[in-house]
């Protein structure tokens, strides 16, 4: 009696499902292509022509990130078309703060059992994020790993490469005392602080994924799955006409941890509380969770997605430009000298 034949599909890896998924995403991927893209989907590597003649001394800037436990909300809501935007945003926002134009993006999707329709929703979000950022989705990896993830769950990661002229790199070294700090508004929690947010909303407040939020017109899933704002086009527009001395992407660590990453030694950032419009979700979380102020500002973006350090003379023009580009922006602080006994580089007043 012959033994039954073992197959890859029987072991949990469905190559046919993978092929179906590739066909579904081909038009999505192609919608992101720039003229520099030299390959079609399905090759071993993605080719992108740098066209170095356009630049004097180009420097490549790379970034990689994920979406974290925000994915848990996508699983609960069974909505998967927004987390791809988050993925792109977390990567491209990290490199545009150094003055780099994002050129291309690659993604990684891992799951226990591939659902081609669900995976296509994820890639649709990634493609939308790439279009918003102006970068091409030139490659990716989809890993089906039986037994590795809970049923219906997945993880995603992204990687982006951009370019900036060497003499136009923004690293904060030109920030000086007296520079003003402009905050660009966030769309909500973005992609950070979700472990604490979930604990407060589901455990402390006892809400369900589709429950209305207090002091809001949104339900829990509508608020918490709002995509991270992508600032690439607005920042690149500013850089054409204004000198920006430093830019901080306010992600995990909030204002308290991210702004010091761009401040020169001896400088501190003083932020005036109440100088910007804070989305109600942050007040809801703070009150329901009885969270201390510093914990809030070290965990969440508190309504500010990016902080720009600029000359005082440019503040009004930059605010006007940002508003014209559809951004909410405010003068929220100033760069000051650290006092002799001062230990923290960020002060909330």
UniProtKB/Swiss-Prot annotation:
The lineage of its organism: Bacteria, Pseudomonadati, Thermodesulfobacteriota, Desulfuromonadia, Geobacterales. It comes from the Bacteria. GO terms for molecular function: ATP binding; phosphoribosylamine-glycine ligase activity; phosphoribosylformylglycinamidine cyclo-ligase activity. Its EC number is 6.3.3.1. It is found in: Cytoplasm. Pathway: Purine metabolism; IMP biosynthesis via de novo pathway; 5-amino-1-(5-phospho-D-ribosyl)imidazole from N(2)-formyl-N(1)-(5-phospho-D-ribosyl)glycinamide: step 2/2. It comes from Trichlorobacter lovleyi (strain ATCC BAA-1151 / DSM 17278 / SZ). GO terms for cellular component: cytosol. GO terms for biological process: 'de novo' IMP biosynthetic process; adenine biosynthetic process. This is Phosphoribosylformylglycinamidine cyclo-ligase.
């Amino acid at each position: 009696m012959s033994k039954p034949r073992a197959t890859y599909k029987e072991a949990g890896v469905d190559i046919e499902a993978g092929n179906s998924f590739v066909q579904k995403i081909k038009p999505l991927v192609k919608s992101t292509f720039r003229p520099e893209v030299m390959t079609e989907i399905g090759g071993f590597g993605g080719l992108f022509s740098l066209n170095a003649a356009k630049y004097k001394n180009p420097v490549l800037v790379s970034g990689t990130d994920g979406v974290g436990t925000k994915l848990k909300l996508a699983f609960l809501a069974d909505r998967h078309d927004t987390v791809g935007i988050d993925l792109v945003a977390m990567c491209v926002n990290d490199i545009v703060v150094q003055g780099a134009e994002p050129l291309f993006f690659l993604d990684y999707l891992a799951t226990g059992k591939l659902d081609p329709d669900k995976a296509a929703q994820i890639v649709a979000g990634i493609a939308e994020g790439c279009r918003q950022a102006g970068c091409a989705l030139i490659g990716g990896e989809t890993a089906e790993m039986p037994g590795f993830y809970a049923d219906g769950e997945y993880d995603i990661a992204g990687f982006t490469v951009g370019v900036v002229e060497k003499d136009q790199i923004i690293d904060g070294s030109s920030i000086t005392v007296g520079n003003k700090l402009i905050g660009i508004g966030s769309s909500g929690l973005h992609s950070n602080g979700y472990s604490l947010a979930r604990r407060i909303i589901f455990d402390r407040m006892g809400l369900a994924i589709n429950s209305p939020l207090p002091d809001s017109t949104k339900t829990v899933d509508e608020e918490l799955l709002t995509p991270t704002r992508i600032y690439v086009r607005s920042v690149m527009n500013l850089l054409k006409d204004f000198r920006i001395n430093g830019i901080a992407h306010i992600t995990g660590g909030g204002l308290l941890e991210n702004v010091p990453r761009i401040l020169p030694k001896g400088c501190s950032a003083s932020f005036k509380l109440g100088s910007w419009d804070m989305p109600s979700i942050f007040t809801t979380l703070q009150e329901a969770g009885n969270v201390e102020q510093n914990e809030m500002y070290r965990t969440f973006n508190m309504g500010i997605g990016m902080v720009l350090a600029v000359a005082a003379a440019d503040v009004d023009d930059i605010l006007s430009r940002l508003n014209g580009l559809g951004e909410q922006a405010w003068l929220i602080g100033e760069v000051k000298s650290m006092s002799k006994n001062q230990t923290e580089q960020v002060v909330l007043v």
